Each structure stands twice: as C-alpha cells, then as structure tokens.
C-alpha cells in the first residue's frame, strides 16, 4: 500500500499536532513534515513534494492562499486543503479558480468531527473539489436570491444533489446519503449542471466548474 504523504502547516502548535494525530489514524496516511508559517510550508513542499498540503489560511510570513499558489505553480499535482475560520467567499474564490481540482476550503468548526478531515483529504486525492457545508449553504442562498432572469431555478432534488457535489461527495456517496438509486442521482447532477450553464465540454466531473460558476455569480 502506497503511503499518502501529507504536509501540515499551522502557526498553532496544538493544531499542527492535532491534525497529525487525526491523519495518522489512517494506516496509509503519513505526515512527512509540519510547518509553522506559510513560507516554511512552501520551502518544505518544494523539497519534499507531498501528495497533499494542509494549510491554515492565516499564517505569519505568508498566508495559506499564497502558499498554496506557490506550491501548485511548481507542483500542480499536489492537493491543497485550506483550513480557515472565515467563510469569506473572496478567500474561497482565490483558491477555487478556473475549475481547479484537488482543492478544498474547509472551516475549522467543521473539523470538530475528526472524520471530516480524513474525508476531505481522501476527496482531494481522488481529484475532487471540496467546499465546507457552510460555504455551500451561503453560495446556494446567494444563488437563489440572484434575480437574473436567465438563471433557471433549481428543483429541490437538484439542489440537494448539487450541495453534496460541492461538498466533495461522488455520485455513489450522494446516492447513499439521499437513499436514491445511482441513475436518478446522475440525472439530477446533470440537470443541475446544465442549469448552471455547464456542458460535457467542462469534463466528466463538472463539480469544479460548478464551484467556479457559483462563485462568479455570487462574488462581486
């Protein structure tokens, strides 16, 4: 079994240690380095090339968003998990650009469930884009409040599927969560994406582009 090599960066030593302990409950996860600021995180990432970098947004010397940019500019295959206390959509937009995959933006409060960090890392490694549920709720509320007439309204079923897509769940997991067969979930996901103006030209996994579209609509 190949080890998943992870970098953890947070200026709070307690949080660094806590994340490491949670991650290493998984036999195939290995925290290969821990950094206490953004600049050190970039230096370590460029040397060790981790599979995933978990970065606090607010760090001294360099914030997590800039650290993520520098890491992925050099090694785009490295997955990024940004952890933040802020649900500011401008922060989210800064990391979720141009249909970016293998990226997550998660709020610290969500990590009270220790399994959530593991789920998010696994989703990022699988190539998905992941947003915190609170961010998803905020985006969907803004989307529904958008009065532009060309925007088709989502049905309740489409919205339920889209929310879980944006949270980084794949279609089999969405089907299990909603208690539906996979085929109706696939149809609902497709129709929701079409209402956002996404087509097959955006790829088989349109979730990253759905994230980008909603951010474009909701972030001034």
Question: Which stretches of residues belong to each language-model region?
Answer:
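Acidic catalytic/metal-coordinating carboxylates
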Residues: 37-40, 62-66
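Short, flexible helix-to-coil linker/hinge segments that flank and couple to helix-turn-helix
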Residues: 93-103, 109-151
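Basic, Lys/Arg-enriched C-terminal extension of HTH/homeodomain DNA-binding domains
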Residues: 189-220
